[in-house]
Amino acid sequence: MAPWLQLCSFFFTVNACLNGSQLAVAAGGSGRARGADTCGWRGVGPASRNSGLHNITFRYDNCTTYLNPGGKHAIADAQNITISQYACHDQVAVTILWSPGALGIEFLKGFRVILEELKSEGRQCQQLILKDPKQLNSSFRRTGMESQPFLNMKFETDYFVKIVPFPSIKNESNYHPFFFRTRACDLLLQPDNLACKPFWKPRNLNISQHGSDMHVSFDHAPQNFGFRGFHVLYKLKHEGPFRRRTCRQDQNTETTSCLLQNVSPGDYIIELVDDSNTTRKAAQYVVKSVQSPWAGPIRAVAITVPLVVISAFATLFTVMCRKKQQENIYSHLDEESPESSTYAAALPRDRLRPQPKVFLCYSNKDGQNHMNVVQCFAYFLQDFCGCEVALDLWEDFSLCREGQREWAIQKIHESQFIIVVCSKGMKYFVDKKNFRHKGGSRGEAQGEFFLVAVAAIAEKLRQAKQSSSAALRKFIAVYFDYSCEGDVPCSLDLSTKYKLMDHLPELCAHLHSGEQEVLGQHPGHSSRRNYFRSKSGRSLYVAICNMHQFIDEEPDWFEKQFIPFQHPPVRYQEPVLEKFDSGLVLNDVISKPGPESDFCRKVEACVLGAAGPADSYSYLESQHVGLDQDTEAQPSCDSAPALQPLLHAVKAGSPSEMPRDSGIYDSSVPSSELSLPLMEGLSPDQIETSSLTESVSSSSGLGEEDPPTLPSKLLASGVSREHGCHSHTDELQALAPL
């Protein structure tokens, strides 16, 4: 403390001892009675209650009104300063009393009363202004002045007060302070008052969060404080009133805990108060949001369920659209007409007629798609054309494993008609076998089932030619529109040839040639319009579309699989087929007839050696072994010497040369999107044996035959012309994949 403050405090103590009676009188009796009268704030009051000069009044405020304290004259310090202490709301309140000095009293307009704590920066200020300003004289120098009460002061604390008159030429620092000390609590209040007991705050106030609950713990107050319980007041920082939670003190422990349940997240203000409201400690705590253990699964379900529902609706919509699209394809074929009703009425009677027996022969070297077409065609012949079809895929493989040749010869003998499905693989391997049938060693493909069957059929065909021309009607060679007539082996040239599905009516009429009187009753039974009347016809349509798609994706699939090249292939321009003929005419639209070569322009390269046929033949004999001697040699085409296997190159025809598309193979409907419908109306034996369609054909397991390796010197050999295929030497410069 500064020396001058210590000196002032000493003089104040001496003055208080000497003038104690005066201070007691100024206090106005008991502190409680005095406080009851003077704790209120007075706006306007008389200058003194004892002077009798009621014509002098002051207006009080808290120094908010700024008046220029500077003046032209000096005004003396206040005289006879006394302090009146009393209790207001269990705290100290003081009132300052003084008298004005005689010097400069005529210039006095008011006083400023400034109260400060000696060891603190806290400051309170009051301002007294004459309500009716007028000039005072020396007769007012004994008039007592009184300030408003100064409230909320501390017990036993040192203060000083300055009374500054204005306007004065002297500054505030030129006026002397008056020091005093507030009285003890037990002097102003009753000794048993709780406000006079020692002040206590808990040393530790711990706040923690457990889920959505808030846990508050603190240490106990000593027993002499007499606290019976505590209250926890809490609220959000920007909320209104406090919420209260009572905490019972446990005497057996050193701490007391309170649990605040279901507290919402936010920034909280927490206050700890005892039951007498004399102890208070505040703290702040941020409650964080807690994620429920069910929040994750609930969120996942909330996201998954709508997605599943949307996906289900999207899938259903897609399926319905595709079904509608397929229905649109067949809708114009399913219109009610006298023809369809006639067909529906005639179908049961057709079932009762004897069914012609048909033996179906095919090549298993053209891939699975071609085998699917063959199998669907067999179903179609049985279901739509009313035939009894013999197909190796439908036979019990375990029973005919060792007797395939005998089974084929038996079926050829028993059948009324023999249908050979010609394809590129059939042409290649049959002609290759015929070309080298004179070889002495066993070939790799000499035991293929279809080679044995074709050899037997060719022998029967040659015998039928010698007997009568009517016997040739038993032998039929068919090819689908992804092949051409040039794919018919030379050994089957004497057979009747049909292109499917263009010549479907003619094929059905051929199969039922002995029943012309029955077919004449319903001529539309086997028309191309009725092609789609049965599920087997639609299944055949899908299988043909899949084969077309496979050829479009890999035009050179056959060459890649069976004709390995030793030299890099010569660059050539791949043919572009704008459309392919579906073989169908919808809504009875008649297509313009044209030669077969307009659709399928094939070049048949009969590779011969530069020195002549004998040299090339001997070279091929050295490269590949011939078939077994048991296999009968078949005659080659009459138009050419012994031919090597033929390779076909497709020439892209001009738009005028291309046949008109009948529209049944709609490019807007990819064949990959169509499914094979189940076959109905089949006999139980055929349904049972049809389960073998996915197994290896009866010709598998007997080995495959590698095609001959063609040397580069034979690439520029002559070109042989055969029935149905035209040679173009200027377009085929080298052997290349299709």
Curated annotation (Swiss-Prot):
It holds the Pfam family IL17R_D_N. GO terms for biological process: negative regulation of epithelial to mesenchymal transition; negative regulation of transforming growth factor beta receptor signaling pathway. GO terms for cellular component: Golgi membrane; nucleoplasm; plasma membrane. Disulfide bonds: none annotated. Gene3D superfamilies: 3.40.50.11530. It is a single-pass type I membrane protein. The chain crosses the membrane at residues 300-320. It comes from the Eukaryota. Residues 321-738 are cytoplasmic. It is found in: Golgi apparatus membrane; Cell membrane. Self-associates. Interacts with FGFR2 and phosphorylated MAP2K1 or MAP2K2. Associates with a MAP2K1/2-MAPK1/3 complex. Interacts with FGFR1 and MAP3K7. This is Interleukin-17 receptor D. The lineage of its organism: Eukaryota, Metazoa, Chordata, Craniata, Vertebrata. The gene is Il17rd.
